């Protein structure tokens, strides 16, 4: 190439750089070998002068080809340690040359694994990484944007001007740039120039921290600086069967559990106040609690209640409070509403120290259309399908991931591993699984596309869920993976090698709807709907079910649990206690939403907080005591959880007394052979001398009674227990003559050490 051609080429490169249209800046910038030695070129928009500093010498750089392309001649390869002195706008500073660091960040194997969808730690390459290259500290930026014409890093480092830091395109649509000297806390985005000339500013899909809403820039954050203290917990978890334990989950939304006053900011460890994050518009002057404050207040509360796990509604970064977190824009970052990533790590660490597991809601089914997010990311439908018939949830106003694309699946599967590895979470609840499994979900005829076989099943999503669960349990065998799946899709909790989806728990939506339909009935009509409370047993062993009374049942005009109940206030309290008691004694793991544990009356509202003042009233305090005691009973009696998924664990005594709306059954444990007798009366009418058959003669201690005075009940019961009579009923030769309190549930335990002739105890219940 002649001199004139080279000069013309450099002029064109300068124009491409100036117009943010250059995809290979390393071809012209940084150290470049030539016949005369080495040329060092720097791209410095709007700089007045630039000098090369090397080996104690300052060499003035010239602009022979473009006013912003500065260059100097040196005799030897300058490497990457040289610095430049830049004068811009009357300010002089020194820096290293970003385009001197030419080595690839993502290696060939990284690119290969990512392209086939199997790079389970891709976040260690993608995103913004505080690192050191050739002894120089800075931040390595790495982005996947295969359809982009050019990509630049913008942010605090360059006054958000995309002309300053163009990135280098690598194989496979990967863009890279190392910015020396950049530190933790810097704000940044990517400026993406599309093939048709449009320019978008996007947050980092792999960003590890983002600004507090309404701002939405990504933040350079350190990944591995937190000192964990939960090694014993983690070792025990991953060496245990996740389901062979009592699981009682407190589902909650961090931002609406309780608020604090903005006049009382949280004082950070360095002694400075944290700027308050307003708690929206329902309570002027209210602010959100920080992760640290939640650790101080929430964890002791949950521990006192006896729950084994906290499930937090989505804490991944999201722009709109009203989405409850289910419209995610920052998949690799806990929301900054409540603090920093390390503060969330400290929250999890504290939970583990107190014996409480942490489950997060994970939303791989869809994402919002926010301009800074994944939608139309690089000028093309990169993360979503291009056809709205399979790529858009019109009712939700969101987009659907293209699960057929390897890199998109990799983004999600690695994200799952990221949360377990980086934040030590113990489980996930996957939201809206049914919306992923069916192509016609919430779609009228003509607005969806069938699969390759002509069916409605989304086979791509099925394969994705199977891959995600398979990889999860490979890495974390003690994890919980819970599906919110509202249809009868088969084998949700069966292993993937058997054709199942690979979850180990599924929310029992049928049980939830049947229970709420039943308990909303006037008790007189319940005799005609006995099937509602018995039907679940006929299918409960088809999956590993978790019983859930979730946030979805206390919003959008459905009212809270207390207000669903019929009758006067006393009956509402009693019905609530009876429902919760039946839930805790029914096969399946447990989840209730915050507020249910004390009888919240108002619907949940994300803009407010819970009605904590209700605990000043004894009936609500009684419901809280009931939940406390149910959790104590549940954890103390393996018959209530050990064989949740084995038919041996449950046996009806009588489910046919429709007229009285009474049911009785046994919960059994195979390992010890112990069992419990459960009797429930779902009408306000008490019953004396009610006979219940039992398998062995002897004394049966009444170990729980939801009608006890301390719970707000009428204090009817069986004097602490009853001996059996030789009166055959329900297929047994022996039976108990019981008093059944109104709207109640009781649990009895056979006491082999107690004689039938023992004197009766003095207590009433």
From Swiss-Prot:
Lineage: Bacteria, Bacillati, Cyanobacteriota, Cyanophyceae, Synechococcales
Family: Belongs to the glycosyl hydrolase 13 family. GlgB subfamily.
Native source organism of the sequence: Synechococcus sp. (strain CC9605)
Catalyzed chemical reaction(s): Transfers a segment of a (1->4)-alpha-D-glucan chain to a primary hydroxy group in a similar glucan chain
GO biological process: glycogen biosynthetic process
Protein name per UniProt: 1,4-alpha-glucan branching enzyme GlgB
Pathway membership: Glycan biosynthesis; glycogen biosynthesis
Annotated Gene Ontology cellular component terms: cytosol
GO molecular function annotations of the record: 1,4-alpha-glucan branching enzyme activity; cation binding; hydrolase activity, hydrolyzing O-glycosyl compounds
Subunit structure: Monomer.
EC numbers, comma separated: 2.4.1.18
Function description: Catalyzes the formation of the alpha-1,6-glucosidic linkages in glycogen by scission of a 1,4-alpha-linked oligosaccharide from growing alpha-1,4-glucan chains and the subsequent attachment of the oligosaccharide to the alpha-1,6 position.
Catalytic residues as annotated in Swiss-Prot or TrEMBL: 431, 484
Cited Gene3D superfamilies: Glycosidases, Golgi alpha-mannosidase II, Immunoglobulins
Enzyme class: transferase
Keyword terms of this UniProt record: Carbohydrate metabolism, Glycogen biosynthesis, Glycogen metabolism, Glycosyltransferase, Transferase
Xref: SMART domains: Aamy (SM00642)
Top-rank lineage group of the source organism: Bacteria
